[in-house]
Amino acid sequence: MKKITLIGSELAKTGNEFIYLGHLNECESCRFKRICHNNLDVGARYKIVSVRSANHPCTVHENGVKVVEVAPAEFTILIESKKALEGVTLTHANVLCDKVCCKNYLSCHPEGISGKYKVSSIFSEKIDCQKGHSLKKVSIISLDESNK
């Protein structure tokens, strides 16, 4: 589902992705606070799908902000093979692993998943896990509150 929000003008480019981290103290008295923050879920990853041309003043972003339309971003992660079913909705849980130097660690512990997600496709490549876990690479879309 697409949502309207504001983002720094320098960052407002179609195709850019971001993880929403919440509002700052500087946002409390801003007249745009509602549109900036009320449509987004903290910790969720979004992709900018369109940018409007008007620029608005902002105390956080030096060059102001633009109105953008965003949608949950699709990205790849690693999950347990037994859970890797196309179309299934899962509640995210990181793969149990403490091997922070492993090349797969960030895919097993991804940022930008807020709760539930839907598996949109499964890759066939073999994943070598240092801990011996049976893993699959999948493409997912985070489900925000309005999609649940």
Curated annotation (Swiss-Prot):
Superkingdom as given in the UniProt entry: Archaea
PANTHER family, A to Z: UPF0179 PROTEIN MJ1627
Family (UniProt): Belongs to the UPF0179 family.
This protein's name: UPF0179 protein Mevan_0979
